[in-house]
């Protein structure tokens, strides 16, 4: 469980209670038309308490009016509390993040190599600083020298320290994190007010949360229903007068509050805020509530193989020469092509070569290193004497053919054998001569088969995109349990895959971390960028994963589904409540004048006065009872969409009809002794 959970404490509850009273301000409450109607009713009741005969002869005691006033006030406070409590969790996390960057100093490295202590707010991009064991990193940056473990729990909530070193995928550091061993020299990448921590605080705290389109649509529906019920109540008054039925204004106010959808009206904002907070608990920052909501509509999920389906670091496990006489040359060539390769794969090749080669391998090679690119799909080194490259089979075969070299007869069968095992083959060439294959082993992450099966039940199709050949991709896809795969997929190809799916009417989600992923992240309906990724990727995405774990996309989509289902379930419950309360209260009010109504009074409430008070009390208590569901969401794990729909209709639809009858009757049995 992540660090946000510690904010479920007494202090936060007290703050939420204070905010509940602050939100009584009509300027605040008018944003929620349903609860605003309740407040207007409460104020009218207060006027009746002070001036009982202002709307005509009063038939109700002042004590009864005060009771109605108090219950209406409590109803509004409960609704305000649910929203304030949900908001408080985000603000508490922002306070924690703010503490991580307070009162920081930095050890600035001068041009002459000397150190000078400065305030962290004085740092400029491009300056170099040194951070030692036990010190807090004062600004975002890139490691240029040193190796150390860093505690990032203040940012990510993950207690295990991570290793940071220059080069590779683990050279980025975040201001506010703690160095727990050794030392690092860091080049500053951000200035005061523009750091990642500052952006996180702005995202989490947010001056004002904008309503999502679905929320606006639902609010419009609920407001329309409220207006309809108001019209019903207004027309009920002359009808009652015609039937010589006395319905005091206070009773009509109470009846209005009971019949309008106050339950979902009081919880709707809390549901949306809590949905964003549940995403935050998984260490994912949502740039808007809309992003989380769209996750609930996702039906196609595009996943990278490396880092998402398999562990990010493929490991060199074997050298496979075209013939045994080539083994030694293959090991040396593989080593030379990887000596300046800072990727995890390159480092694993160097380690394996050192383990297998008897003689001492050169530590430094004077030559020009050619790094891997998505276009060439190869890397290597060119010296005065030789050129050595390793790369994807298709790229290497094409290169040798272009230079009129020979293709060994067994090279393709070696590659196919590696691919059939789910591994990645890299062909090694020296001076345009193929020496053999490096077997990079992919390991599929635990538990993915079950999670993909769960997504399938929820109606979500999974598509694996990989640069591997079709045989390797098919093997991995079958083992992992994904629905489809796209082999030999370049970053730019992902946009085509996304557009093709969107053209079919699908809502698409994907993950990415590189600059070349940015266009696809922007094109996808939901883009989840890694915190360790480039700035352009994070700007293009609408979700950022602080743990840089691409598998999180699965959890975020499930949370989005849960958000929509929670909103739907509680709306169903609220509307069913209104129907039940309508048939529970009206017969009790009108049976004295219309005897035929007695047959509809199935609850046998003791009197019209106790019926109104009981319904009002139930109306207030049900909001409190449903706050935990609004905060945690309804359960969706392991069920198909149809099964979830049936379950929700039985629990929240049928339950919404039955619970008011039982609840109001039980309360009436107690209230009748006091009214």
UniProtKB/Swiss-Prot annotation:
<dbReference type="InterPro" id="IPR023299">
    <property type="entry name" value="ATPase_P-typ_cyto_dom_N"/>
</dbReference>
<dbReference type="GO" id="GO:0000287">
    <property type="term" value="F:magnesium ion binding"/>
</dbReference>
<dbReference type="InterPro" id="IPR018303">
    <property type="entry name" value="ATPase_P-typ_P_site"/>
</dbReference>
<keyword id="KW-0406">Ion transport</keyword>
<dbReference type="GO" id="GO:0016887">
    <property type="term" value="F:ATP hydrolysis activity"/>
</dbReference>
<feature type="binding site">
    <location>
        <position position="513"/>
    </location>
    <ligand>
        <name>Mg(2+)</name>
    </ligand>
</feature>
<feature type="transmembrane region" description="Helical">
    <location>
        <begin position="644"/>
        <end position="664"/>
    </location>
</feature>
<dbReference type="GO" id="GO:0005886">
    <property type="term" value="C:plasma membrane"/>
</dbReference>
<keyword id="KW-0597">Phosphoprotein</keyword>
<feature type="transmembrane region" description="Helical">
    <location>
        <begin position="34"/>
        <end position="54"/>
    </location>
</feature>
<keyword id="KW-0633">Potassium transport</keyword>
<feature type="active site" description="4-aspartylphosphate intermediate">
    <location>
        <position position="304"/>
    </location>
</feature>
<dbReference type="GO" id="GO:0008556">
    <property type="term" value="F:P-type potassium transmembrane transporter activity"/>
</dbReference>
<keyword id="KW-0812">Transmembrane</keyword>
<keyword id="KW-0067">ATP-binding</keyword>
<comment type="similarity">
    <text>Belongs to the cation transport ATPase (P-type) (TC 3.A.3) family. Type IA subfamily.</text>
</comment>
<keyword id="KW-1278">Translocase</keyword>
<feature type="transmembrane region" description="Helical">
    <location>
        <begin position="611"/>
        <end position="631"/>
    </location>
</feature>
<feature type="binding site">
    <location>
        <position position="390"/>
    </location>
    <ligand>
        <name>ATP</name>
    </ligand>
</feature>
<feature type="binding site">
    <location>
        <position position="341"/>
    </location>
    <ligand>
        <name>ATP</name>
    </ligand>
</feature>
<comment type="function">
    <text>Part of the high-affinity ATP-driven potassium transport (or Kdp) system, which catalyzes the hydrolysis of ATP coupled with the electrogenic transport of potassium into the cytoplasm. This subunit is responsible for energy coupling to the transport system and for the release of the potassium ions to the cytoplasm.</text>
</comment>
<dbReference type="InterPro" id="IPR036412">
    <property type="entry name" value="HAD-like_sf"/>
</dbReference>
<dbReference type="InterPro" id="IPR006391">
    <property type="entry name" value="P-type_ATPase_bsu_IA"/>
</dbReference>
<dbReference type="InterPro" id="IPR008250">
    <property type="entry name" value="ATPase_P-typ_transduc_dom_A_sf"/>
</dbReference>
<keyword id="KW-0472">Membrane</keyword>
<dbReference type="Pfam" id="PF00702">
    <property type="entry name" value="Hydrolase"/>
</dbReference>
<dbReference type="InterPro" id="IPR044492">
    <property type="entry name" value="P_typ_ATPase_HD_dom"/>
</dbReference>
<feature type="binding site">
    <location>
        <position position="345"/>
    </location>
    <ligand>
        <name>ATP</name>
    </ligand>
</feature>
<dbReference type="InterPro" id="IPR001757">
    <property type="entry name" value="P_typ_ATPase"/>
</dbReference>
<keyword id="KW-1133">Transmembrane helix</keyword>
<dbReference type="GO" id="GO:0005524">
    <property type="term" value="F:ATP binding"/>
</dbReference>
<keyword id="KW-0813">Transport</keyword>
<feature type="transmembrane region" description="Helical">
    <location>
        <begin position="569"/>
        <end position="591"/>
    </location>
</feature>
<dbReference type="Pfam" id="PF00122">
    <property type="entry name" value="E1-E2_ATPase"/>
</dbReference>
<feature type="binding site">
    <location>
        <position position="517"/>
    </location>
    <ligand>
        <name>Mg(2+)</name>
    </ligand>
</feature>
<feature type="transmembrane region" description="Helical">
    <location>
        <begin position="216"/>
        <end position="236"/>
    </location>
</feature>
<keyword id="KW-1003">Cell membrane</keyword>
<keyword id="KW-0547">Nucleotide-binding</keyword>
<feature type="transmembrane region" description="Helical">
    <location>
        <begin position="65"/>
        <end position="85"/>
    </location>
</feature>
<feature type="transmembrane region" description="Helical">
    <location>
        <begin position="245"/>
        <end position="265"/>
    </location>
</feature>
<protein>
    <recommendedName>
        <fullName>Potassium-transporting ATPase ATP-binding subunit 2</fullName>
        <ecNumber>7.2.2.6</ecNumber>
    </recommendedName>
</protein>
<feature type="binding site">
    <location>
        <begin position="372"/>
        <end position="379"/>
    </location>
    <ligand>
        <name>ATP</name>
    </ligand>
</feature>
């Amino acid at each position: 469980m992540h660090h946000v959970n510690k904010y479920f404490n007494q202090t936060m509850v007290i703050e939420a209670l204070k905010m509940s009273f602050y939100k009584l301000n009509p300027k605040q409450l008018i944003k929620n038309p349903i609860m605003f109607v309740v407040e207007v009713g409460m104020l009218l009741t207060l006027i009746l308490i002070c001036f009982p005969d202002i709307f005509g002869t009063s038939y109700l005691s002042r004590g009864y009016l005060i009771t109605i006033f108090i219950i209406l006030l409590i109803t509004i406070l409960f609704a305000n509390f649910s929203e304030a409590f949900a908001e408080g969790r985000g603000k508490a996390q922002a306070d924690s993040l703010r503490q991580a960057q307070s009162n920081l100093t930095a050890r600035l490295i001068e041009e002459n190599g000397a150190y000078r202590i400065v305030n962290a707010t004085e740092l400029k991009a491009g300056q170099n600083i040194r951070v030692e064991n036990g010190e807090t990193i004062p600004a975002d940056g890139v490691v240029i020298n040193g190796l150390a473990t860093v505690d990032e729990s203040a940012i990510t909530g993950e207690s295990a320290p991570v290793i940071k070193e220059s080069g590779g995928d683990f050279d980025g550091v975040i201001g506010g994190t703690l160095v727990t061993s050794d030392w690092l020299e860091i080049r500053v990448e951000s200035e005061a007010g523009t750091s990642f921590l500052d952006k996180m605080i702005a995202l989490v705290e947010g001056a004002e949360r904008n309503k999502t389109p679905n929320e606006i649509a639902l609010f419009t529906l609920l407001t329309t229903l409220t207006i309809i019920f108001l019209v019903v109540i207004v027309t009920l008054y002359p009808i009652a007068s015609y039937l010589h039925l006395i319905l005091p204004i206070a009773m009509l106010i109470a009846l209005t509050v009971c019949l309008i959808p106050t339950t979902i009206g009081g919880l709707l904002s809390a549901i949306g805020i809590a949905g964003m907070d549940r995403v935050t608990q998984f260490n994912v920052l949502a740039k808007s509530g809309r992003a989380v909501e769209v996750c609930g509509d996702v039906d196609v999920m595009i996943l990278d193989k490396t880092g998402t389906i398999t562990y990010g670091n493929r490991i060199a496990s074997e050298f496979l020469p075209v013939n045994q006489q080539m083994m030694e040359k293959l090991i040396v060539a593989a080593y030379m092509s990887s000596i300046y390769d800072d990727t995890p794969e390159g480092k694993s090749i160097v380690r394996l070569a050192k383990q297998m080669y008897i003689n001492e391998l050169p530590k430094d090679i004077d030559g020009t290193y050619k790094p891997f690119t998505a276009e060439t799909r190869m890397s290597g080194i060119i010296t005065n004497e030789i050129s050595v490259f390793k790369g994807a089979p298709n790229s290497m075969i094409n290169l040798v053919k272009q230079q009129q070299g020979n293709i060994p007869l067994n090279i393709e069968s070696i590659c196919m054998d590696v691919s059939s095992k789910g591994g990645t083959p890299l062909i090694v060439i020296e001076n345009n001569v193929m020496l053999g294959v490096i077997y990079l082993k992919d390991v599929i992450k635990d538990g993915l088969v079950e999670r993909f099966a769960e997504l399938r039940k929820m109606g979500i199709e999974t598509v694996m995109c990989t640069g591997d050949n079709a045989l390797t991709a098919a093997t991995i896809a079958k083992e992992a349990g994904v629905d489809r795969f796209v082999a030999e997929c370049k970053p730019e190809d992902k946009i085509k895959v996304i557009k093709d799916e969107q053209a079919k009417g699908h809502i698409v989600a994907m993950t990415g971390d590189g600059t070349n992923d940015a266009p696809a992240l922007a094109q996808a309906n939901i883009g989840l960028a890694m915190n360790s990724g480039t700035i352009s990727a994070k700007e293009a995405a609408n979700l950022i994963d602080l743990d840089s774990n691409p598998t999180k996309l699965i959890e975020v989509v499930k949370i989005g589904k849960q958000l929509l289902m929670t909103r739907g379930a509680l709306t169903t419950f609220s509307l069913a409540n209104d129907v039940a309360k309508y048939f529970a209260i009206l017969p009790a009010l009108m049976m004295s004048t219309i005897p035929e109504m007695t047959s509809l009074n199935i609850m046998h409430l003791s009197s019209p006065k106790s019926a109104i008070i009981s319904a009002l009390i139930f109306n207030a208590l049900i909001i409190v009872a449903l706050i935990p569901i609004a905060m945690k969401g309804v359960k969706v794990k392991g069920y198909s969409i149809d099964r979830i729909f049936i379950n929700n209709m039985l629990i929240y639809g049928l339950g919404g009809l039955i619970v008011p009858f039982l609840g109001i009757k039980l309360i009436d049995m107690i209230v009748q002794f006091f009214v």
